[in-house]
UniProtKB/Swiss-Prot annotation:
It catalyses: GMP + diphosphate = guanine + 5-phospho-alpha-D-ribose 1-diphosphate; XMP + diphosphate = xanthine + 5-phospho-alpha-D-ribose 1-diphosphate; IMP + diphosphate = hypoxanthine + 5-phospho-alpha-D-ribose 1-diphosphate. Belongs to the purine/pyrimidine phosphoribosyltransferase family. XGPT subfamily. Pfam families: Pribosyltran (PF00156). Pathway: Purine metabolism; GMP biosynthesis via salvage pathway; GMP from guanine: step 1/1; Purine metabolism; XMP biosynthesis via salvage pathway; XMP from xanthine: step 1/1. One of its GO terms (biological process) is IMP salvage. Keywords: Cell membrane, Glycosyltransferase, Magnesium, Membrane, Metal-binding, Purine salvage, Transferase. This is Xanthine-guanine phosphoribosyltransferase. Guanine binds at D92, I135. Transmembrane segments: none annotated. It is a peripheral membrane protein. It comes from Buchnera aphidicola subsp. Baizongia pistaciae (strain Bp). The gene is gpt. GO terms for cellular component: cytosol; plasma membrane.
Length: 153
């Protein structure tokens, strides 16, 4: 993927607030399940905006910075309920989204960004992104991409 969509911290906060508005009224929600790692920061922003205190994680491994790899569930979260919001940063090819839908069919599944191959899997999202565009999230960047201190072996 040669084209990139650069997301700044400011943009992410604005988009998360827009997503939170779509999730009102808040009394319909009991908690949030973040899809780790991409959904961690959007989940924190939504939890703040909606004043939700219960936040859990499902840990899914699918990317190595910009390379898709086999999906693995590292940790499950309890909570298949229509009162739970599942949050990820994006839906891309739909691999993770299909797993989320199968595990939590009653939950509300939301993302900030959606690409064409996966967007039918989410209930709400904010920004359409073309399939061949790579999204650079602010937690992955300094001035340029910074490798994590610890990498997969």
């Amino acid at each position: 993927m040669s084209k990139k969509y650069i997301v700044t911290w400011d943009m992410l906060q604005i988009y998360a607030r827009e997503l939170a508005q779509k999730l009102l009224p808040v009394n319909q929600w009991k908690g949030i399940i973040a899809v780790s790692r991409g959904g961690l920061i959007p989940s924190a922003l939504l939890a703040r905006e909606l004043n939700i205190r219960f936040v859990d994680t499902i840990c899914v491994s699918s990317y190595d910075h910009n390379r898709l790899r086999d999906l693995k569930i590292l940790k499950y979260a309890a909570g298949n309920s229509s009162q739970i919001i599942i949050v990820d940063d994006l839906v891309d090819t739909g691999g993770t989204g299909k797993i989320i839908r199968n595990l939590y069919p009653k939950a509300k599944f939301v993302t900030i960004f959606a690409k064409p191959m996966g967007k039918l899997l989410v209930d709400e999202y904010i920004i359409d992104i073309p399939q061949k565009v790579w999204i650079e999230q602010p937690w992955d960047m300094g001035v340029t991409y910074q490798s994590p201190l610890v990498r997969d072996l």
